[in-house]
Amino acid sequence: MPNRFLADPDPTTAWARAAVEGKLFPVGELVRHAAERHLRDIRDGERRGIFWRPEEAAHALGFLPAVFQVTDGPAAGQPFYPLEWHTFVVGSLFGWRTATNRWRFRHGWLETGNGQAKSPLMGAIGVYIMGCCENPRAQCYAIGEDKATANVQ
């Protein structure tokens, strides 16, 4: 299924609006709160020293299909376009900045069911952080239920 939010000039914010409105897909309480926070912080975050940079979010989102391919299943060999929920995760991690232009979020935690492309997403985020963010000595860690799960990255 194509990601309907990537065509929007600010796909992360478009996803957040859709999540809050609840018209396109169901979300849990914590996800809705995160989407509400995103929209609220766009409105008044600058007073608290946080800034939304949609171009930074778009750069990270564009990195995934430009560099990575699907490696398994019927879509093998095709560009790895982020799933719709990836749009909010990746955009939030890389689009929010502090007054000193550092990332607002320095840690991320993802939990979701099987088949949601967590491993490819986390691998892509790790490569992006280590190679494309001008962050010397960048470190990325992936954890899993056990060593075999963590090694999938």
Name each model feature, range by range.
Residues 2-153:
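Phosphate/NTP-binding elements of NTP-utilizing enzymes
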